Amino acid sequence: MKFTPELESGVLIKRYKRFLADIMLPNGQEITIHCPNTGSMKNCLFPGEKVWFSTSDNPKRKYAHTWELMQTDQQHYIGINTGRANALAEEAINRQVITELLGYEHLKREVKYGSENSRIDILLTSQNRPECYIEVKSCTLLEDQMGYFPDAVTTRGQKHLRELIHMVELGHRAVLLFVVQHSAITSVKPARHIDPHYADLLEQAVANGVEVLAYKTALSPQGSLITSACKVML
């Protein structure tokens, strides 16, 4: 996934009201940009360090700029825009990078499913194979060299796990795919210390046949690309 036009940089001042962030441009100008991340962004906010943002030419947007990456002083990149995860996953499936998901003929996005008014991120189908329901999650929380999900209590994420369990019960295939958007993360673990109910549900999901995958993303101001699998610690 290439960033077009190219990203511009600034320095983070603060994030506030969840969806906004103030940054300072290289010329000293302060601007407000959109923060496309509903999580707590724990351990992802470093005031005074570099941010990278995209620019939209849509005149109807209140904020023309969108925060895409955080670049730490240790030169690690963090994908701030969680909305990119689904597109990265779709691209990786089409490039046959995610080997566990090979062999399907058709891919659909945002398909209604389940019993709790949900939409699945990706649905893979093929003749003579069970449908494959894939829920995509962006993992950015780094603690003690370990990646954790979620970074805040997520009732929505809990609902998605229940839906995946239900799909397996109906005879389908169900996959939880963590797209790792932090260059320092090498393995992923459920954040029981943050959302114990989610961790319990994930254990239940695995016991009932839901598959859990995690794949690393190469991040840079030029573009982002899912590259390889990383370990899931359950």
UniProtKB/Swiss-Prot annotation:
It holds the Pfam family SfsA_N. One of its GO terms (molecular function) is DNA binding. It comes from the Bacteria. HAMAP family: SfsA. Belongs to the SfsA family. This is Sugar fermentation stimulation protein homolog. The lineage of its organism: Bacteria, Pseudomonadati, Pseudomonadota, Gammaproteobacteria, Alteromonadales. The gene is sfsA.
